Amino acid sequence: MLTFIGLGLFDEYDISLKGLEAVKEADLVYAEFYTSCLMGTNPEKMEKLYGKKVHLLSREDVEQHPDWLDNARDKKVAFLTGGDTMVSTTHVDLRLRAEKLGIETRLIHGASITSAVSGLTGLQNYRFGKSASIPYPYESRRGTKVISETPYDTIKQNSSFGLHTLVFLDIDKDKGFMSVNIALKLLLEVESKRGEGVMDRAVAVGIARAGSEKPVVKAGYAEDLKGFDFGKPLHILVVPGKLHFLEAEALVKLADGPEEIMENIE
């Protein structure tokens, strides 16, 4: 049996009671934190709460050589992930691999950043369009900096339908956790290059450390927000589309947004 367990958003205490019981009953416990991680804890704290050794897996262990799956043929194996366990396509692929090997699987869900963002900002979850991810720039063969324009295009498309865009920020082994500030600067660089009016007067909302006791939620114009101090990671970004009057009020009251956004409402 292979049980996928979502750990929630921030620390070891975000796990559900059902998830905690499954971990305690498991013969082996594995975890991966390269798709998402819990910034308020570490493996040692998890092991103390769970009473079990947590074996950390690399990207290669999960995606290329998941030999550890064989243990689930005749043992109870728990696989831990940040957030909700099936939001990442990596985990869907892993589940399908297990099923093809004849291994029974089950899911125990956890809190997801996609629902937490709606709760923290007041933006209605059914008004979100396609999400986007901003990677760090890379250097071309000619030595020039290459910035992905795909997130800009996604925001543009969603905005044309009045929809909000949830923007995931890169987690890089060498460069670390991308901040809201870097993400906005990259989007504004693309705006400067293309001049299509997507980001120059756009309202954005930055969220830091969702799930913690003191998350930061700040709304403002992208140009202004890029200088705001969001503090430690993890960060995530939202670029709202057309605002319902309750959403606009929430951004002003709950995210310290500018009063002018009350004018851009349905």
UniProtKB/Swiss-Prot annotation:
The keyword Ribosomal protein does not apply. S-adenosyl-L-methionine binds at L9, D84, V87, S112, I113, L169, A210, H235. Its EC number is 2.1.1.98. One of its GO terms (molecular function) is diphthine synthase activity. Keywords: Methyltransferase, S-adenosyl-L-methionine, Transferase. It catalyses: 2-[(3S)-amino-3-carboxypropyl]-L-histidyl-[translation elongation factor 2] + 3 S-adenosyl-L-methionine = diphthine-[translation elongation factor 2] + 3 S-adenosyl-L-homocysteine + 3 H(+). Homodimer. HAMAP family: Diphthine_synth (MF_01084). Belongs to the diphthine synthase family. This is Diphthine synthase. It comes from Methanosarcina mazei (strain ATCC BAA-159 / DSM 3647 / Goe1 / Go1 / JCM 11833 / OCM 88) (Methanosarcina frisia). The gene is dphB.
